[in-house]
Curated annotation (Swiss-Prot):
Superkingdom: Eukaryota
Bias (Basic residues) ranges: 92-112
GO BP: any one term: tRNA transcription by RNA polymerase III
Upper lineage: Eukaryota, Metazoa, Chordata, Craniata, Vertebrata
Organism listed in the record: Homo sapiens (Human)
Name this polypeptide is given: General transcription factor 3C polypeptide 2
Chaperone found in the keyword field: no
Length: 911
């Protein structure tokens, strides 16, 4: 019988051949796989060649028990069984093949070779086959070699010799052919096995979930264990006096978006667990710590945690980026300070000599109904329980700033401010104007956290200016203050600070302010009080250059920003025409610095660019990196700038008309106050806007129904304060803006009112006001349009919140009143807004970081201490800073005589 060629086995229909009937052999399953493999590799020309396994006749099927014999019987049957390949070749019938092709499924080029009979098959010896991987390398088809069918049968017979064992965990070495799919090679199985092992290694090597520093480790993020411990902040500091109860424990906050669960144990192909990367603009991939429980002040710990974190960050920043001494050439000179007489100072003084009537209602204290009216440059004593202070400046307040003091100095606090001379005066922005004005410096005493201020706020001295309205003023952030008792040779005076003024005549004036004690010691005993001085500024900053100077091109200077990091050599100013100008203060360039005949300096900018299409209303530097600056203009745009590439902003946002903004130290964004004329319905108020790096959406900090005139942020507290046209001053604790604020729940718990001012009409006389309308908080809308008409028939009612504690805050009356005002507006724009708040400033100093000063249209300036946000952590920082400051700057005392008598020696008489 003809053979079918090397590597090809054709099996015909099963039937009796001689005395032997061909039935399914133990290698039929392997032959089925070979059949599928061979059929998949056949070309179109070989489609006619078919190969199939014999189908057993009815009654001759083998049962599973018959196919699986014991090892002894299998070995005996194998010895008695002839070569299966030769027997199958004998019973197979050759099929017609095309000329020039070799039967066996492989195409061979060239002339047809004469067919040779198959060599006798070798006995089934295990050593002839590679035990490790028989199919790892393809065998060349040569004469004398066995076919694939023979090799597979040899492999099968060898496996039959082995005793039955448990199925190995690793995949089989041969091919696997799932139904309807191509054969799966061993390389794919090895790769899958490698991925499974890699997944197991990664799952064991992944770090544990991140928890609060110095806190207990959370073993399972899904089932945290309650641990009794003091309150801990993310910054890693324990807070003394924190409640040690079972309600406070650290728990990993569950993500809003559920993570996909890991593969089940029944899954045959688990996917590797790889840590997920966090793209920009998405929530943090790592699990953030979350503080449960309540803080001692009544606020939840998760609200107070950013406050404690900001204390650490601000302290570290000031130690690295602030300086103790800068601008050594600008020391106050006594002969430049000319004391004005009463007649000379009269044009510069505000016109109003008495304040409007006002009353103060304090939450939790009985109402006394006392009406106050104080004189110009006078104040009232601080309240013994609430520590609030009030004084009258004489006119509407439009500029305000604290004098920076080094950490730990323990010195008196000062604020500089500007009030308009006339209560009814308007200030056009489109043209330059000049006129008399008074810059005021007020002393507030040593403001502490432990005790009420012992001294009243007092008017220290004033500076007469002829440059019109002062729209903004800024102190040098550090390096300009020295001890009041610093010995200086006359005429030098100890310096209090460097102050820059943005004036309506387009100029920027720079003053070197002396300490009041040293300056007042120079005046005669019969000097006029209050002390008003005419001062020569140390430098005048103008736009343009030496050959082209026209201040009218840029218009009024509306905003200032001092470089926040040492050496503070750059000062930025925003103008009416949209120009932002930068001066290099210590420059020696003859093109930027000119010495005038009176000894003062005139400086020209080294850089300027057009930032907005209209007036630049506010500027702020990035405290973390001085290369970045943000500006807001009347074109409703907020722009972030990289000063190394000022030709294009790195981000521009057009939202609404911004009035003021604050860029807090820890965060990559700004908090913006807005005018409600362009605000969308329901979105008027205070927003936090990301600079664009993280891609977070705007966070709605607090809704407001009126225009928010001023906004201030405290780096120490991570808190912002805002005053609006309705006379309400509120504060809001920002969440951790390093994380996406979209997941912040119940922002109403983060804000609280400080006080609310209402204009209340009285019926008959100032001594008999309508206290019923005052207590109800719903004033009748008056129609007075001038200051005189308003104060003749109305008084101001200040309703203060108890800031010592925030327990049960959401159900307290000031909080309910604030929420009611956020729902509907009570503004009456047909009258003078005497209760409006124009300026708000948090203290930047560590010694008084919880104090807040505010003032507005009435000319009354009020000082409050947010005692509830002060913590033992801040108090400990104050003590450490005072010890460090005293060790560095304590003046050496002169040698004193000893307080005891020297030892005397005398001879004793002899007995």
């Amino acid at each position: 019988m003809d053979t079918c060629g090397v590597g090809y086995v054709a099996l015909g229909e099963a039937g009796p051949v001689g005395n032997m009937t061909v039935v399914d052999s133990p290698g039929q399953e392997v032959l089925n796989q070979l059949d599928v493999k061979t059929s998949s590799e056949m070309t179109s020309a070989e489609a006619s060649v078919e190969m199939s396994l014999p189908t057993p006749l009815p009654g001759f099927e083998d049962s599973p028990d018959q196919r699986r014999l014991p090892p002894e019987q299998e070995s005996l049957s194998r010895l008695e069984q002839p070569d299966l390949s030769s027997e199958m070749s004998k019973v197979s019938k050759p099929r017609a093949s095309k000329p020039g092709r070799k039967r066996g499924g492989r195409t061979r080029k060239g002339p047809k070779r004469p067919q040779q009979p198959n060599p006798p098959s070798a006995p089934l010896v295990p050593g002839l086959l590679d035990q490790s991987n028989p199919l790892s390398t393809p065998m060349p088809k040569k004469r004398g070699r066995k076919s694939k069918a023979e090799l597979l049968l040899l492999k099968l017979s060898k496996d039959l010799d082995r005793p039955e064992s448990q199925s190995p965990k690793r995949p089989p070495e041969d091919f696997e052919t799932p139904s309807g799919e191509r054969p799966r090679r061993r390389a794919a199985q090895v790769a899958l096995l490698y991925l499974q092992e890699l997944a197991e290694e990664l799952s064991t090597a992944l770090p544990a979930p991140v928890s609060c520093p110095e806190g207990p480790k959370v073993s399972s993020p899904t089932k945290p264990k309650k641990i009794r411990q003091p309150a801990a902040c993310p910054g890693g500091e324990e807070v003394d006096g924190a409640p040690r109860d079972e309600d406070f424990f650290l728990q990993v906050e569950a993500e809003d978006v559920e993570e996909s669960e890991g593969p089940s144990e029944s899954s045959s192909e688990p996917e590797p667990v790889v840590p997920r990367s966090t793209p920009r603009g998405s929530t943090s991939g790592k699990q953030k710590p979350h503080c449960r429980g309540m803080a001692p002040n009544g606020l939840p710990n998760h609200i107070m945690a950013p406050v404690w974190k900001c204390l650490h960050l601000t302290k570290d920043f000031r130690e690295q980026k602030h300086s103790y001494w800068e601008f050594a050439e600008w020391i106050p000179l006594a002969w430049k300070w000319h004391l004005l007489s009463e007649l000379e100072a009269a044009p510069y003084l505000p016109q109003e000599e008495k304040s409007p009537l006002f009353s103060v209602q304090r939450e939790g204290l009985p109402e006394d109904g006392t009406l106050y009216r104080i004189n110009r440059f006078s104040s009232i004593t601080a309240h013994p329980e609430r520590w609030d202070v009030s004084f009258f400046t004489g006119g509407p307040l439009w500029a305000l700033d604290w004098c920076p003091v080094p950490e730990g100095a323990g010195a008196s606090q000062y604020v500089a401010l500007f009030s308009s001379p006339d209560m009814n005066e308007t200030h056009p922005l489109s043209q330059l104007h000049s006129g008399p004005g008074l810059l005021q410096l007020w002393g507030l005493g040593t403001l502490q956290q432990e005790s009420c201020p012992g001294n009243r706020a007092h008017f220290v001295y004033g500076i007469a200016c002829d440059n019109g309205c002062i729209w903004d003023l800024k102190f040098c952030p550090s390096g300009a203050w020295e001890l009041p008792g610093t010995p200086r040779k006359a005429p030098l005076l100890p310096r209090l600070g460097l102050l820059a003024l943005a004036c309506s005549d387009g100029k920027v004036l720079l003053f070197s302010l002396p300490h009041p004690e040293a300056l007042l010691a120079q005046q005669p005993p019969d000097a006029v009080k209050p002390a008003i001085y005419k001062v020569q500024c140390v430098a005048t900053l103008q736009v343009g250059s030496m050959q082209a100077t026209d201040p009218s091109e840029c218009g009024q200077c509306l905003s200032l920003a001092w470089m926040p990091t040492r050496p503070h050599q750059h000062l930025a100013a925003g103008y009416y025409n949209g120009m932002v100008v930068f001066w290099n203060l210590p420059t020696n360039s003859p093109l930027q610095r000119i010495r005038l005949s009176d000894g003062s300096l005139k400086l020209y900018p080294f850089q300027c660019f057009l930032a907005h299409d209209q007036a630049v209303r506010t500027l702020q530097w990035c405290k973390a990196n001085s290369h970045f600056l943000v500006s807001a203009g009347s074109d409703r745009k907020i722009k972030f700038w990289d000063l190394r590439r000022p030709y294009e902003p790195i981000n521009s946002i057009k939202r609404f008309l911004s009035t003021e903004l604050a860029w807090l130290l820890p965060y990559n964004g700004v908090t913006v106050a807005q005018d409600n004329c362009y605000a969308s319905y329901g979105l008027c108020g205070i927003h936090y806007i990301d600079a664009g790096y993280l891609g977070f959406k705007a966070y709605f900090t607090a809704p407001r129904k009126g225009t928010v005139w001023s906004l201030s942020g405290s780096d120490w507290l991570g808190t912002i304060a805002a005053g609006d046209i309705s006379g309400e001053l509120i504060a809001a604790i920002l969440p951790d803006m390093a994380l996406n604020p979209i997941n912040v729940k119940r922002p109403v718990e983060r804000r609280f009112p400080i006080y609310k001012a209402d204009l209340i009409p009285y019926q008959d006389s100032p001594e008999g006001p309508d206290h019923s309308s005052a207590s109800s908080g719903v004033p009748n809308p008056p129609k007075a349009r001038t200051y005189t008409e308003t104060v003749n028939h109305h008084y101001l009612l200040f309703q203060d919140t108890d800031l010592g504690s925030f327990h049960d805050l959401l159900r307290r009356e000031p909080m309910l009143r604030m929420q009611e005002g956020e729902g509907h507006s009570q503004l009456c724009l047909d009258r003078l807004q005497l209760e409006a708040i124009h300026k708000v400033r948090f203290s930047p100093n560590l010694d008084s970081y919880g104090w807040l000063v505010s003032g507005g249209q009435s000319g009354l300036v009020r000082i409050h201490f947010v005692r509830g946000l002060a913590s033992p952590l801040g108090h400990r920082m104050q003590l450490e800073s005072r010890a460090h400051f005293n060790a560095m700057f304590q003046p050496s005392s002169p040698t004193r005589r000893p307080g005891f008598s020297p030892t005397s020696h005398r001879l004793l008489p002899t007995p």
